[in-house]
Design a protein with these regions (language model features):
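Soluble extracytoplasmic regions of secretory-pathway and membrane proteins
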Residues: 1-457
């Protein structure tokens, strides 16, 4: 897959070129994006000026906006109004508009939904999906309250949080649709009665879009910060806070940083089925070792199901910060980093990922090389893989994993050899005579063949 490309290879694109084309069976009938994540200024479309044409034919006519988003500005009064509103006289004096022209504004999707529904809180991580025709932004909306009875406040601001709605924003037209994700949430039900028609049932979302829904990362992070204390169900242990957790720690540069939850595809819950999961590695509070993994299901059928995998408390499992230290002190990796980290270039280590696999923990970290000039285009150079005390760096994941397994097998062979007692060679017979039996102890005492046993020998 493109996600498993080799180091030093050029980046592999899922979609590329204009018009977009794909080597991975991705199709998109309308690739235009008028609403996105940046702080876009207003836009007037369609107009008498051609827009960028998505056609591969260089002689093809330019394209024009054909959506229903925005506000028509065919009259002088509206042009004057928006010219004053945006403090831009070009809106009033331009001669490039026509009777079909519309002004598009609030084109940042977060600003758009916050303006429409200021009583909802939104996830900071909108993501784009496709139904093979248009592009859509999906956002998670929350209802909150600081007044929920008998609930501990979080961060001093709220003690009630529900992922009440999934919000869909059409990237072409800007149309916003709210789908009720939690029908049992009393706050969203109250808003539904206040604003009839605001929320649609989740079943009304297109199936090809509903398959892209995922468990919200911000919600899961809040849940894990609370669960870090309340996973202790024994009263004495909870009272003494003997097993309080925190997010596993790593380093970014010289600064310690948490490994917050991230999305992965694993067969962790069912060995016969790969699933899209949200994973959080957890460590004991104040320690660098790994204590457990918590995963939330994102696929249909397991959506929202949270599972915890504990490591035995007496077993030491290296945490990400300890693996970071092993990487730093590996002489072969250090030599490579020193060679690359010369004038004009800099090494940047990517996010360290924790993967449970085959009954053990595997760490993976990409290594990028980037320019120190103004224009920085990071290039994937190497992949670091680690298991136990061993760290390996190679150009791709498969080669690195194979080398790592070889070193682990060599380590196991050395341990097996150390456990076996050294055999004492028997003297060769002279002229066909039988070897002489060792003297000092009769046969049957456990010292046959000259093998020494006993604390004084």
């Amino acid at each position: 897959t493109p996600a498993a490309q080799d180091g030093e290879d050029p980046i592999t694109w899922f979609l590329r070129d204009i018009p977009p084309r794909s080597d991975y069976a991705l199709t998109l009938a309308n690739p235009a994006i008028y609403f996105g994540l940046k702080d876009y200024d207003y836009a007037i479309a369609p107009s008498d000026i051609d827009e960028l044409s998505p056609s591969a034919d260089p002689d093809a006519a330019g394209s024009h906006y054909q959506g229903a988003g925005g506000v028509p500005i065919s009259s002088l009064f509206r042009k004057l109004f928006y010219s004053i509103y945006f403090q831009d006289s070009d809106i009033f004096f331009t001669r490039n508009t026509n009777s079909a022209s519309r002004i598009l504004y609030r084109r940042n999707v977060l600003e758009r939904v916050r303006t429409l529904t200021p009583f909802l809180i939104f996830d900071e991580d909108p993501y784009v999906v496709s139904d093979q025709t248009n592009l859509y932004w999906i956002l998670d909306a929350y209802t909150t309250s600081p007044w929920y009875p008998n609930a501990e406040p979080f961060d001093g601001r709220l003690n009630y949080l529900r992922n009440a709605a999934k919000v869909l924003v059409n990237a072409y037209t800007g149309q916003v649709t709210y789908y009720l994700a939690d029908p049992n949430d009393p706050i969203s039900n109250a808003y539904r009665r206040i604003y009839p028609g605001l929320f649609q049932p989740l079943s009304a979302m297109k199936p090809e879009l509903r398959r892209h829904l995922r468990y919200p990362r911000d919600l899961f992070e809040v849940q894990m910060r609370i669960y870090a204390r309340y996973h202790q169900t024994e009263p004495d242990r909870f009272f003494n806070q003997e097993d309080t957790w925190q997010f596993a720690q790593t380093y970014r540069g010289d600064q310690a940083a948490e490994i917050t939850p991230y999305y992965v595809t694993l067969n962790l819950l069912d060995p016969a089925r790969y699933e899209f999961l949200l994973l959080a590695p957890m460590s004991p509070k104040g320690l660098d070792t790994l204590r457990g993994l918590v995963v939330a299901g994102c696929d249909e059928g397991r959506y929202g199901r949270i599972s915890t995998f504990y490591f035995p408390k007496g077993t030491q499992v290296y945490g990400p910060s300890q693996i970071h230290a092993l990487i730093d002190q590996d002489t072969r990796i250090s030599q490579e980093f020193t060679l690359w980290d010369q004038v004009g270039s800099a090494i940047e280590r990517g996010r360290m990922l924790v993967f449970p696999t085959a009954g053990t923990i595997l760490y993976i970290q990409p290594v990028y090389l980037k320019s120190t000039t103004r224009l920085k285009i990071p290039e994937l150079k190497r992949i670091i893989v680690s298991q136990g005390d061993y760290v390996v760096m190679d150009t791709n994941l498969e080669a690195g994993f194979a080398t790592l397994q070889e070193r682990l097998q060599q380590h196991r062979n050395r341990l097996e050899g150390a456990r076996q007692p050294a055999a004492i060679e028997q003297p060769e017979p002279v002229n066909g005579a039988a070897p002489e039996r060792p003297r000092g102890k009769p046969a049957g005492t456990g010292l046959e063949g000259g093998a020494a046993a006993g604390p004084n020998q």
